[in-house]
């Protein structure tokens, strides 16, 4: 068993499959809310919410596992397909408004469409190469780990580098964080009840990645609060001077 075809799962996993599907739906709901929220925020604030490289990596991963190596689980495939469609909207908004964030770097500002295209192509071929190297089932999970770490670290770095909550919100953070936590729950069930194929999820590197995700994404909320308070203090200072 390669761990990708759920119909081949042992009876122990089949018994908890409804709960696993619930986690998958939770993951999908969280990320759909996040993607829709990012598109809305991008057009409202004329900026982009997801850092460039994580966005390219994420959409490339979704293309690979919706088109080239689709899951045999209808629930999982449906969630990925919906996420991919909305993610194209995220990418479109990012291409339109990203130049407003790069006026300090003219070379980047003038070539952002090319940067997005090359980034997606690079990560797409990387995910395909990983699938060819270790098989789609393992590459699916390891590729998702890479996407998640890039999203977590990239999101925090973007918040701190901007020094502004522009393009971000508690809703975007929590939908992303809780959606990814549902992925952890789904993976935990596979590890516990399908060890023939998923015992490797208890490996040191996976546990390290989980710890980094929880630490970085958990600290995002704290950093967001501090940046928000700083913005409020600046506005109050300006209002006081104007009086």
From Swiss-Prot:
Pathway: Secondary metabolite biosynthesis. GO terms for molecular function: lyase activity. The keyword Disulfide bond does not apply. It is a multi-pass membrane protein. The keyword Lyase applies. Coiled coil: none annotated. It comes from the Eukaryota. InterPro entries: PaxB-like (IPR039020). Keywords: Lyase, Membrane, Transmembrane, Transmembrane helix. Its EC number is 4.2.3.-. It is found in: Membrane. Terpene cyclase; part of the gene cluster that mediates the biosynthesis of the indole diterpenes janthitremanes such as shearinine K or shearinine A. The geranylgeranyl diphosphate (GGPP) synthase janG catalyzes the first step in janthitremane biosynthesis via conversion of farnesyl pyrophosphate and isopentyl pyrophosphate into geranylgeranyl pyrophosphate (GGPP). Condensation of indole-3-glycerol phosphate with GGPP by the prenyl transferase janC then forms 3-geranylgeranylindole (3-GGI). PANTHER family: PTHR42038, TERPENE CYCLASE AUSL. Belongs to the paxB family. This is Terpene cyclase janB. The gene is janB.
